[in-house]
Amino acid sequence: MRTNCWWRLSGYVMRHRRDLLLGFGAALAGTVIAVLVPLVTKRVIDDAIAADHRPLAPWAVVLVAAAGATYLLMYVRRYYGGRIAHLVQHDLRMDAFQALLRWDGRQQDRWSSGQLIVRTTNDLQLVQALLFDVPNVLRHVLTLLLGVAVMTWLSVPLALLAVLLVPVIGLIAHRSRRLLAAATHCAQEHKAAVTGVVDAAVCGIRVVKAFGQEERETVKLVTASRALYAAQLRVARLNAHFGPLLQTLPALGQMAVFALGGWMAAQGSITVGTFVAFWACLTLLARPACDLAGMLTIAQQARAGAVRVLELIDSRPTLVDGTKPLSPEARLSLEFQRVSFGYVADRPVLREISLSVRAGETLAVVGAPGSGKSTLASLATRCYDVTQGAVRIGGQDVRELTLDSLRSAIGLVPEDAVLFSGTIGANIAYGRPDATPEQIATAARAAHIEEFVNTLPDGYQTAVGARGLTLSGGQRQRIALARALLHQPRLLIMDDPTSAVDAVIECGIQEVLREAIADRTAVIFTRRRSMLTLADRVAVLDSGRLLDVGTPDEVWERCPRYRELLSPAPDLADDLVVAERSPVCRPVAGLGTKAAQHTNVHNPGPHDHPPGPDPLRRLLREFRGPLALSLLLVAVQTCAGLLPPLLIRHGIDVGIRRHVLSALWWAALAGTATVVIRWVVQWGSAMVAGYTGEQVLFRLRSVVFAHAQRLGLDAFEDDGDAQIVTAVTADVEAIVAFLRTGLVVAVISVVTLVGILVALLAIRARLVLLIFTTMPVLALATWQFRRASNWTYRRARHRLGTVTATLREYAAGLRIAQAFRAEYRGLQSYFAHSDDYRRLGVRGQRLLALYYPFVALLCSLATTLVLLDGAREVRAGVISVGALVTYLLYIELLYTPIGELAQMFDDYQRAAVAAGRIRSLLSTRTPSSPAARPVGTLRGEVVFDAVHYSYRTREVPALAGINLRIPAGQTVVFVGSTGSGKSTLIKLVARFYDPTHGTVRVDGCDLREFDVDGYRNRLGIVTQEQYVFAGTVRDAIAYGRPDATDAQVERAAREVGAHPMITALDNGYLHQVTAGGRNLSAGQLQLLALARARLVDPDILLLDEATVALDPATEAVVQRATLTLAARRTTLIVAHGLAIAEHADRIVVLEHGTVVEDGAHTELLAAGGHYSRLWAAHTRLCSPEITQLQCIDA
């Protein structure tokens, strides 16, 4: 890969031959003109010295024409060169996304989202930085070749002296290439790790906040950032070592040529004009030589980035697409023939599974969490290929079938209802984008989501936000079901499709499903007894083995494990009594103390929020000392660079014209000393700037991330999560890049301008007026450029965040996109966003291409004016030839910093946009305040006082006038239809959100007055969205209490019934879990979440659908543990399954965001209202007479 990455990149560049030819052609022509201009200068000076009054007007016309041609050629070179960079970056990004869309399950398990983000952003930017200079490489090489040719024509001895340093420069460049490549690659790997920490914390933000672990996540980031800091410092040291050295060697060569050329001119071997022309050529070549040396550094960084991007592009799925299409008409059978499979070699998850589903039959597969049900579904949809055996659909091995024909026949309802950004209608029609509104409405009606949609102001055009997290779990699940039904599949695979809906809605859905699957093959992976009414046969899985297959009655009779899994929860009344005496329950005064003691991880310094109205500015002030030292060294370096023209003037006027060779030698020696001093100062400046820049980056990233962690959940909705990831990664780097390089360039430019203007005024004030004639034009052009480019950069920055958000979304929902053959539409969406970003980049490049060459044009015009008028004054004896030469050299130096300032403005714009975004983020109010009340032990009284709440993305309020008082120690179950506001109530108690109106009080105190972290440390929360961080199973359980012992972790797992599932995993509690728990089933994740909440021993327990992914047997264990845990502590439970509601102290029924019923179980049943209907449906669904279950009329 490393050996051919340049060839691969050149292949991408060659896709745009027209742009390449135009850019190279303009570079070639511009180089020829630039090399020939010094010959014109030679002629003008020689004519001036000869004082023969030859007309200079023709040469003026030539110089002006050359300036105009150079402007046009520079515009073409810059525009098309930049356009190539943006086009290639877009091509690489699209190829990387296409590779992502091809991934099978194993590739998806291999790549983390952090790696994806870094490789498609930071690494691509490194490649783009090099591609911007592709035409410049040819220009510089041509300049060197033509320059050497011209210098050889002017003077062979001087030319030989000039090229002596080339081998030395080549050796140093080769050594720097080897060292920098390894260092940069290492730094990029650490950068990916940092991005991975940020992305995981953003994805799992609900879990982070639930357990008050914001500071812990910040510590993770600080730890990863320290490793990145060390790696980046090594790169900075190497750059400081090689960069100044490679730039100093050409300057030493110039001093050598000055000494020898001056001696030859004094001896009459060459004319003064020849010497000046040679010096002009050498000066012209010094810049390309330095630039090429700098490009070597950029090239090594770009190479490291290119290798990583190409690795992503070259990633291939392990499975091979078949060649046979699946018959489009026949009904399908599904058969597993002695199937064994493991995610890791020698660790089978499924063992010798032989199972068949006849065409038109419905098979239900039941099993405990971790038994292999979801893995079996993944094999049917061919996310993975079996290790042994075969999976056959319609009698054909799925490995022989084309993926497109296979997946077109399958409809999938996954256990995790993944939605995509867009509207509700677009998500329902995800598998059939050509569906009519009537077809979408029919599918929605079948999934019982239509009523909810009709309450929304925008109906089916309502945006669901990123991953649909603004909707309730039941609403997302019903949209996923409607999506599968609209697809009209011949084989329907459903993984607990109604686990998050209430009993009444489930009955209605079952009636629709019974009709929908009547003429098609269906496989239902379920933990719910009610879904078995749809099945013709049942298969029982346990620990990856098939225990039994048959009709529900047959299996019930002969399979003890089946009866155990589906046995309804026993009467839990006795458990309530036992719970009162249980030794695991502590007195109220002791509850929650360990959670508070063991989760307050403190890492002082790097993430303390700087106070004040402008926290970003205050933060940067902390580095005033190092930054001032860096800028002082830069100023010294710049002043040293202004001395050579004065020394040259002295050498020409005294050493050459007056034949005082000692003056020439002293000038050359002083110039050499100046170059050496400048090299030392430049090295020191680079070291200080490198260290300071990395320190600022470390600090800024930590502060921004820590502040983002403290924001409310609403900041992470829509594409807010992607924008936060961009702020912590790309935006902070843009600011520091400007401080490290742009600010240095600004200081150099300003010092240079001031110094040159002083020198020019001292030499000949009158000629300065000629230069000033161009300044108003330059100022007007700069203002116009700044105004036009500012809008472009802001839009481009926002669009980059959208590109990143789309990438993250499809990385998370890739299996759904593949299952519904939506890869091409995903590619189109990503292409549209990436192409918008590309077009904005090209627009910005056009502005740059218009502006920078215009600065060079003004410089050429000013040089022409000074040269002509100065030559006239030389003839008149007003100024010396040396003064004129010095003037011309200073003019070149004068407009160079102006151009660099303009170029620096490009970096400034990027940094300014990034700073604005970060300033806005840091200025966003956090739920906690400095005057927040510290939280001690909580009794647990919860009061909702006229509480209203509306989500930002919805006009319909989620809660409307909630008035409830929950005494301390009471267990309350919230029930109601999906979307009625139950989860929102839990989130308000957890203070994920603050009420729009009204107050939530705990122990008589408004939650907004509490220290939010201290308060959450008193809670135990299980959210609907299960998330675990990468690490071991033990780490996942101990997330809310990191210092818990192994015995305490195991005890928590046993108490919630998770221990058998964990011990069945490879390595048990040390089993490695991927970020988000992608290698675990929903049931396994839910058990870990329950154990996690149990371990913190909370004062208030909040459970939001904590058992929806569990089988009845495991649910019974969990419910007993919940009742034990709930004794003598306030417990709020959101439940669709009503088994636990019967034994709660109180039941609250919500509908449309209001409380419609409130009372005990027996009271509400006697009332005959909403709860009575829910209970009747629940009772029917959970009846032991499985074969006789009938859903009531919803």
From Swiss-Prot:
Residues 334-568, 942-1177 form the ABC transporter domain. PROSITE patterns: ABC_TM1F (PS50929), ABC_TRANSPORTER_1 (PS00211), ABC_TRANSPORTER_2 (PS50893). One of its GO terms (biological process) is xenobiotic detoxification by transmembrane export across the plasma membrane. It is an enzyme of class 7 (translocase). The ATP-binding domains (NBD) and the transmembrane domains (TMD) are fused. It comes from the Bacteria. Belongs to the ABC transporter superfamily. Lipid exporter (TC 3.A.1.106) family. GO terms for cellular component: peptidoglycan-based cell wall; plasma membrane. The chain crosses the membrane at residues 20-40, 56-76, 130-150, 153-173, 258-278, 279-299, 628-648, 660-680, 743-763, 765-785, 847-867, 878-898. ATP binds at residues 367-374, 976-983. Residues 21-301, 628-910 form the ABC transmembrane type-1 domain. Its EC number is 7.6.2.-. Pfam families: ABC_membrane (PF00664), ABC_tran (PF00005). It comes from Mycobacterium tuberculosis (strain ATCC 25618 / H37Rv). Keywords: Antibiotic resistance, ATP-binding, Cell inner membrane, Cell membrane, Membrane, Nucleotide-binding, Repeat, Translocase, Transmembrane, Transmembrane helix, Transport. It is found in: Cell inner membrane. One of its GO terms (molecular function) is ATP binding. Efflux is inhibited by reserpine. Its main location: membrane. Overexpression in M.smegmatis increases resistance to erythromycin, ampicillin, novobiocin and vancomycin. It also reduces accumulation of ethidium bromide in the cell. This is Multidrug efflux ATP-binding/permease protein Rv0194. It is a multi-pass membrane protein. The lineage of its organism: Bacteria, Bacillati, Actinomycetota, Actinomycetes, Mycobacteriales.
